[in-house]
C-alpha cells in the first residue's frame, strides 16, 4: 500500500527518511551531511519521484523509487 508522504506527521516522516539514508548500502562513497541526504529524499517525495510503501504483513514502511513501483499500484 502506498502512503502519501504528506499524511505522515513531520517527525515521523523525518525519522523514516533518516532511517533510509543511514542504512547500509545507501552510502555513495562521499561524505555527504545527513541533512543534505534527508533534503534530497524529501525533495524526491515532493516531486513524486519517491514513494512510501507500507507492507501490511510485516508492518514496515520503506522508501522506493516511483519507477520501481508496479504501474497498477499507482492508479
UniProtKB/Swiss-Prot annotation:
InterPro entries: UPF0270 (IPR010648), YehU-like_sf (IPR036685). Disulfide bonds: none annotated. Pfam families: UPF0270 (PF06794). HAMAP family: UPF0270. Belongs to the UPF0270 family. This is UPF0270 protein Avin_35000. It comes from Azotobacter vinelandii (strain DJ / ATCC BAA-1303).
Amino acid at each position: 500500500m502506498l502512503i502519501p508522504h504528506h499524511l505522515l506527521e513531520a517527525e515521523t516522516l523525518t525519522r523514516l527518511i533518516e532511517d533510509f539514508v543511514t542504512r547500509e548500502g545507501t552510502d555513495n562513497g562521499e561524505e555527504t551531511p545527513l541533512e543534505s541526504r534527508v533534503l534530497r529524499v524529501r525533495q524526491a517525495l515532493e516531486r513524486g519521484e519517491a514513494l512510501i510503501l507500507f507492507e501490511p504483513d510485516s508492518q514496515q514502511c520503506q522508501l522506493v523509487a516511483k519507477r520501481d513501483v508496479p504501474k497498477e499500484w499507482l492508479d
